[in-house]
A protein has these predicted regions:
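Short amphipathic alpha-helical segments, especially helix-boundary/capping motifs
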Residues: 43-47, 137-140
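N-terminal glycine-rich cofactor-binding segment
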Residues: 49-56
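Predominantly extracellular/luminal regions of secreted and cell-surface proteins
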Residues: 20-45
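Accessory beta-strand-rich segments of carbohydrate-active enzymes
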Residues: 3-11, 16, 25-30, 57, ...
Length: 174
């Protein structure tokens, strides 16, 4: 299986971007704390419940799904570096080089974080995403996802399930 490598927003394509889809480290734990050890690799942007992810595990309520990878910022200098997530199901916190840069709630909406201040220049940078998906518990929109699929209901899908990418943009941008 190959990750989605194309630019995710063709109508707004910028030259200075870096697609972060591909293998990431992952762990499923009972804690929001960064794990000491990783369970293996997951292919982003596929949910861990999906065979294409290489994991094939269902995230249970109360569990945390952690993602980690290293990256270099997009080529160029100046401006701002934005980290885009096409979608993460359901709630997440994002750290760059050990600094919390933001988070998001809602499994179907894209979000963007400005990570410029947390970057280590042009070198190696660490990205950690902690996700929790309370499928079957809580009031979040979930469509037909369930932990007990059958009939018209299908298995829950959690975590990063849309493209993740970086862009270098001018200081003033749309």
């Amino acid at each position: 299986m190959h990750p989605l490598t194309e630019y995710p927003r063709p109508a707004m394509r910028r030259d200075s971007y870096e697609n972060l889809n591909g293998p990431w480290q992952y762990a499923i734990t009972a804690s929001a704390q960064r794990p000491a050890d990783w369970d293996g690799e997951i292919l982003v942007p596929y949910a861990p419940e999906c065979r294409a992810s290489g994991v094939g595990r269902t995230l249970q309520p109360g569990q945390w799904l952690h993602y980690h990878r290293y990256f270099a910022p997009p080529a160029g200098t100046g401006g701002r570096v934005l980290l885009h997530f096409g979608a993460v199901d359901y709630a997440c916190a994002v750290q760059v080089n050990g600094h919390l840069v933001g988070g998001h709630r809602g499994g179907y909406w894209p979000f963007t974080l400005d990570i410029t201040a947390q970057l280590n220049g042009t070198g190696r940078n660490s990205l950690w995403v902690a996700v929790q998906d309370p499928t079957g518990h809580g009031t979040q929109a979930r469509g037909k996802q369930t932990l007990q699929p059958g009939g018209m209901f299908y298995p829950a899908q959690s975590g990063i399930w849309q493209t993740v990418w970086l862009e270098r943009v001018p200081e003033n941008h749309i």
